[in-house]
């Protein structure tokens, strides 16, 4: 969104075409979230999270190759598909590393990290555009994601495999989790069971109502401020 004014000017993209680019990202993100969650369960948090982060890095960097709104829509759709794993993976890591009674504060800190990233990214993107080009903004973002993915692969370990934990710390984490998290062979819920679960709808419905506002602000506010109020 921070790059939208520059992209629209240099690639001659209309507001309607920009909306298609946003829709491509949002649709891919939405469809891929349950798929990404399944992949994370199959591959595990460490490998699954790293795989999606590398894909995000590749697709983000490849956005620099786009020469039209159609190319941008394809690239951003691919980014959305890879990014769909980030919140499920973060929550899964939180569930692995914190007992149930401390899960809320763990997720709170996870959200703080997401917010800090969202705060840092726009100035970084604008700096790259002003100092270099809009293509460089996507290349830098992709490179940083790749570095992070490598660091994740090196440093992240499940509590069972983390040698720096004492036995007491490890037992505190694992024994404080729900029963299904204590054994790797626990039976997973089916899609039907999830959809019949009232707790699922208690989470899903507020998100369904909140996401349109968040998505609109995130995608359109920078462009609105640029066109209506003349922000640079």
Predicted regions: what is each one?
Residues 12, 44, 65-71, 82, ...:
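Helix-breaking motifs and short loop linkers at transmembrane-helix boundaries and internal kinks
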Residues 75-114:
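Cytoplasmic helix-loop-helix junction between adjacent transmembrane helices
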Residues 31-70:
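Conserved MFS/SLC helix-loop-helix module at the cytosolic interface between two early adjacent transmembrane helices
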Residues 26-34, 118-119:
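Residue-level signature of mid-helix packing/kink "hotspots" within the transmembrane helices
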Residues 2-16, 219-232:
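Short amphipathic helix-loop junctions that connect adjacent transmembrane helices
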Residues 110-163:
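Helix-loop-helix hairpin linking two adjacent transmembrane segments in secondary transporters
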Residues 197-232:
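Extracytoplasmic gate region of multi-pass secondary transporters
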């Amino acid at each position: 969104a921070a790059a939208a004014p520059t992209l629209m000017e240099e690639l001659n993209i209309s507001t309607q075409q920009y909306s298609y680019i946003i829709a491509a990202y949002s649709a891919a993100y939405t469809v891929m979230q349950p798929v990404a969650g399944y992949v994370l369960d199959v591959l595990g948090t460490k490998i699954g999270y790293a795989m999606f982060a590398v894909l995000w890095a590749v697709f983000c960097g490849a956005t620099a190759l786009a020469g039209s709104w159609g190319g941008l829509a394809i690239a951003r759709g691919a980014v959305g598909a890879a990014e769909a794993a980030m919140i499920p993976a973060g929550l899964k890591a939180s569930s692995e590393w914190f007992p149930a009674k401390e899960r809320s504060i763990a997720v709170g800190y996870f959200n703080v990290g997401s917010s800090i990233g969202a705060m840092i990214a726009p100035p970084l993107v604008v700096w790259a555009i002003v100092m270099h080009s809009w293509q460089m903004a996507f290349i830098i973002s992709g490179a940083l994601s790749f570095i992070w993915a490598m660091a994740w692969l090196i440093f992240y370990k499940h509590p069972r495999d983390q040698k720096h934990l004492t036995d007491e710390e490890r037992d505190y984490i694992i024994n404080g989790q729900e029963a299904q998290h204590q054994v790797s062979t626990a039976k997973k819920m089916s899609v039907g069971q999830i959809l019949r679960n009232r707790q699922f709808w208690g989470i899903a419905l507020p998100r369904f109502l909140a996401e349109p506002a968040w998505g609109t602000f995130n995608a359109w506010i920078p462009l609105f401020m640029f066109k209506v109020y003349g922000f640079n």
